[in-house]
Amino acid sequence: MTTVLVTGGAGFIATHTDIELLNKGYDVISVDNYGNSSPVALERVEQITGKPVKRYDGDVRDEALMERVFAENNIDWVIHFAGLKAVGESVAKPIEYYDNNLYSTLVLLKVMKKHNVKKIIFSSSATVYGTPKELPITEETPTGGTTNPYGTSKLFQEQILRDVHVADPSWTIVLLRYFNPVGAHESGLLGEDPKGIPANLTPYVAKVAVGELKEVQVYGDDYDTPDGTGVRDYIHVVDLAKGHVAVIDHIDKEGVFVYNLGTGHGYSVLEVIKAYEKAAGHPIPYAIKPRRPGDIAACYADASKAEKELGWKAELTIDDMAASSLNWQTKNPNGFRDAE
């Protein structure tokens, strides 16, 4: 039986990945401090799959805790999701972002090395490409020139992982660069549950659609894009989750492997709002605001390498993303808090 340690295992992308792993017959162990998530999410994973998740409640930066996790379990793979993830907040709180994101990775790698566990999938991001010179973005597109500490922290973590492989080529390191994960589990039991006002577009649009917030804030309508609003490659979180399972199923050799996980198609902010209007059956009010610091005009993937090497491709559409996200929001207006 393959055992997978999922750091930040109660998070948005992680819980959807937990489900795909459990459904494939893998054992899942979660370490999470619930800084931006809820233990209820793991209960929902168990409810959906009918299988247990072994929980360790705590911080990946706690070396004694991580030592215990590795001593008590026979871990085959690690998927490292744990970290802070809001672009705007990272600009305001760079020290916290570097401390949390880099230190957690260093502690994790130190303990993995000690216990001779050398297979890791790292939850990276398209932000490592900075402002891309050309689109679509391939895995060969230069990285660097990141526009915010969140993206820079992901780039630094990628470099740390590459250096670990240089020092010891017996490691298997997979860098998955996510584009913009959205949507929710079809059951309506799991979805994105940001604490406070959502920093990401789609949970914000969903809250406006159900009348919880007044209007969508559209940051900038003067970008060099077809309708002036920012264009991103939105990918359904369930497709993204399946990408992680595809890695474990397909990669059985040492090395550093890099994959973009996106749909290959960019949608503007206004197109996303239209998809939510279609799902909700009514107009969604929005207001144009100034651009946000650290944002870029457009970003979308060429994900053909993942299809060729992992047999993976995104299958769900922007309409699926909007409908599932609204279903989650309608059934859980307060996220997981009602069940806590």
UniProtKB/Swiss-Prot annotation:
EC code(s) of this entry: 5.1.3.2
Q: Which UniProt keywords apply?
A: Carbohydrate metabolism, Galactose metabolism, Isomerase, NAD
Could you say which residues bind NAD(+) here? 12-13, 32-37, 59-60, 81-85, 100, 125, 150, 154, 179
Reactions that this protein is recorded to catalyse: UDP-alpha-D-glucose = UDP-alpha-D-galactose
User: From the Swiss-Prot or TrEMBL record, what is one GO molecular function term?
Assistant: UDP-glucose 4-epimerase activity
State if Mitochondrion is listed as a keyword: no
The protein's enzyme class: isomerase
Q: Which residues are the active-site ones?
A: 150 (proton acceptor)
The cofactor(s) it depends on are: NAD(+)
Q: In which pathway does it act?
A: Carbohydrate metabolism; galactose metabolism
The record's function comment reads: Involved in the metabolism of galactose. Catalyzes the conversion of UDP-galactose (UDP-Gal) to UDP-glucose (UDP-Glc) through a mechanism involving the transient reduction of NAD. Can also epimerize UDP-GalNAc to UDP-GlcNAc. Involved in the lacto-N-biose I/galacto-N-biose (LNB/GNB) degradation pathway, which is important for host intestinal colonization by bifidobacteria.
Q: What family is this protein classified in?
A: Belongs to the NAD(P)-dependent epimerase/dehydratase family.
- NCBIfam families of this UniProt entry? galE, PRK10675.1
Its protein name is UDP-glucose 4-epimerase
From what organism does this protein derive?
Bifidobacterium longum subsp. longum (strain ATCC 15707 / DSM 20219 / JCM 1217 / NCTC 11818 / E194b)
Q: What is the lineage of its organism?
A: Bacteria, Bacillati, Actinomycetota, Actinomycetes, Bifidobacteriales
